Amino acid sequence: MELRPWLLWVVAAAGALVLLAAEARGQKIFTNTWAVHISGGPAVADSVARKHGFHNLGQIFGDYYHFWHRAVTKRSLSPHRPRHSRLQRVPQVKWLEQQVAKQRAKRDVYQEPTDPKFPQQWYLSGVTQRDLNVKEAWAQGFTGRGIVVSILDDGIEKNHPDLAGNYDPGASFDVNDQDPDPQPRYTQMNDNRHGTRCAGEVAAVANNGVCGVGVAYNARIGGVRMLDGEVTDAVEARSLGLNPNHIHIYSASWGPEDDGKTVDGPARLAEEAFFRGVSQGRGGLGSIFVWASGNGGREHDSCNCDGYTNSIYTLSISSATQFGNVPWYSEACSSTLATTYSSGNQNEKQIVTTDLRQKCTESHTGTSASAPLAAGIIALTLEANKNLTWRDMQHLVVQTSKPAHLNANDWATNGVGRKVSHSYGYGLLDAGAMVALAQNWTTVAPQRKCIIEILAEPKDIGKRLEVRKTVTACLGEPNHISRLEHVQARLTLSYNRRGDLAIHLISPMGTRSTLLAARPHDYSADGFNDWAFMTTHSWDEDPSGEWVLEIENTSEANNYGTLTKFTLVLYGTASEGLSAPPESSGCKTLTSSQACVVCEEGFSLHQKSCVQRCPPGFTPQVLDTHYSTENDVEIIRASVCTPCHASCATCQGPAPTDCLSCPSHASLDPVEQTCSRQSQSSRESRPQQPPPALRPEVEVEPRLRAGLASHLPEVLAGLSCLIIALIFGIVFLFLHRCSGFSFRGVKVYTMDRGLISYKGLPPEAWQEECPSDSEEDEGRGERTAFIKDQSAL
């Protein structure tokens, strides 16, 4: 009987070590949850779940549901085929997938927090113009009022004195524990401080004497607790799709491991959540997803291998240090759109924000700190013009970001004269410029997509491969593009050492984008399977002409591989070049920079010029506008061209019931004066990976050597785990014999005079045996129980 407790501990430890070793080798860890597509509504889903022993955790979105089974192992190296097969045979089940635990890393650079004090936030209003020009946006009257931001992370401390005044329960949920409370789980190391820190950057309350001030200090702030548990496709999708017609902006500072060898991105449900967000969120204007570009700089990682930052639906944000340098943790890639400030070297200041346990910190770091600053600036911009679409916001970022004060050796001028860098995108966000341009912004034309198959037959990569193709960008077709936004090079290739590859794409106007730089830690022989490398560097260029793809082996090794598929995907509009400003006349008051602020009678203000007729998509309205003088801000009542509602092509007012005509994809209701949208067409499913190309026999020997080398890390990981297990067993047996301590079936880790945190159980629960994993959690009112063990081991 005395041996039973430590035998159980050894078995449990061995199982945990096996799972850890499997994760280290990249093996899939299957959970006891399923994502299920069921037709018929929630009642049918509940009925199917009950009939087959599942518990319906709730709706992900649409007809997709999250099922859990108490009898299935919580973490397993193999899928549970019997349960899967039974559910698959149900007629109402259209699709299902047992969920796989994913590795997602929070993107902050760890440092011990310092004592709180009231700080100076140098990045909001600096004396040397090394700031984000936020004070100018505040001076124009924009503080984020009416805008809702949600932080997708490990929860937020909703009762923090600097957050409570702006907390929004409608923008919050605990996906990990399936309840509305996003309060983080407390630990001794404060592991779950990440979301609270990010929230304070966006919307910390102003003028209350606590900590600092958020960029959008009158915005509403919420949080989704989704990183403090198993992160699956369903968990990500539920988080990304939370309340999309209430939340305007989602800020995420996490992603796949920044280890320089991972290639990973959103799976089926998360990808669908992104698409639904931009097409249906905010009443059809599109949810805005702000993403941290990644902290893998020290590992020579590339954010183009991260399918979240590499997505056209996310606004990817990088970091700059206080002195305008590239931080040591920053990743360079062509999908980054812009930059905000964050931490740098030891002599450079960091970011001030709220911290866990109702504290304040001056040490928030990494691209984790950059993305929330961008979310705050976007909140100010949305307050200036709530009718901006998700693509309008990206255009505003491109047109107003500033390369000044940012140091890098890769600044280049693209085909339309804009400076762009793989480390900074188009430069630092400028809050003042963004809100000024947003107020009279013309909604961009509907997005077009032109797909061009480039490769006719597989090509050997060798030392260097160059693929050239002249395209007309779908000329003569309804999806013809003459003004670019995003460009994707979708590549399928095999290669015996993926990390040695460097890939570049050159546009017809000469802009050279690095789609992939060499990654020394990536020893994988998996290659890429229809991976969409994305670049923003050719924004506003004309895509017609010759495109060049370059793939090269950066090492001296005799590597080998084959490019089997190359699809060029162009996104943009049919507009001819950049829109010229309207002819200026009828101006009554000009600023020193020759921008009109007041028009004569009979004229309306449009993009700092006066026009007699507002352009299509705008309507004249008399509004209070903010005019910044040298020492003050004056409020002037003037006629301004304001945007029509996003559903209207032309209008007589800003409301959705003021439409006079509709876009081509919608029809006008002459009675209600509204435009009804046509349903979205379904997306094509991803093509299957082609079979591997046959190799000459002379290549068998190097391939075998590469295979043996690639398994060396797995062998070392296995041996390490075995040694750790032996040491653990010996030490545990010795301590057990010395202390005579008996566990009596209670699963509690103890340390001498240590505080042990355990989420969801009140203190009295420790006097009884722990409930099984299958039982319903109780006592949710107390989020953390601290147990102080007085026994000496």
UniProtKB/Swiss-Prot annotation:
Names of the cofactor(s): Ca(2+)
Q: Where is this motif: Trans Golgi network signal?
A: 772-778
Spell out where the chain is glycosylated.
387, 440, 553
Q: Where does Ca(2+) 2 bind?
A: 174, 179, 181
Q: Where is this region: Disordered?
A: 160-186, 673-698, 766-793
Activity regulation text: Inhibited by the not secondly cleaved propeptide. Inhibited by m-guanidinomethyl-phenylacetyl-Arg-Val-Arg-(amidomethyl)-benzamidine (m-guanidinomethyl-Phac-RVR-Amb) and 4-guanidinomethyl-phenylacetyl-Arg-Tle-Arg-4-amidinobenzylamide (MI-1148). Inhibited by Decanoyl-Arg-Val-Lys-Arg-chloromethylketone (decanoyl-RVKR-CMK). Inhibited by heparin/heparan sulfate-binding.
Tell me how the protein is altered or processed after translation.
The inhibition peptide, which plays the role of an intramolecular chaperone, is autocatalytically removed in the endoplasmic reticulum (ER) and remains non-covalently bound to furin as a potent autoinhibitor. Following transport to the trans Golgi, a second cleavage within the inhibition propeptide results in propeptide dissociation and furin activation. Phosphorylation is required for TGN localization of the endoprotease. In vivo, exists as di-, mono- and non-phosphorylated forms.
Taken from the record's topology, the Lumenal segments are: 108-714
Stretches for region Cell surface signal = 758-761
| Pfam families for the chain | P_proprotein, Peptidase_S8, S8_pro-domain
Pull the Cytoplasmic topological domain ranges from the record: 736-793
Comment block on domains: Contains a cytoplasmic domain responsible for its TGN localization and recycling from the cell surface.
Q: Which family does it belong to?
A: Belongs to the peptidase S8 family. Furin subfamily.
State what protein this is by name: Furin
Q: What lineage does the source organism belong to?
A: Eukaryota, Metazoa, Chordata, Craniata, Vertebrata
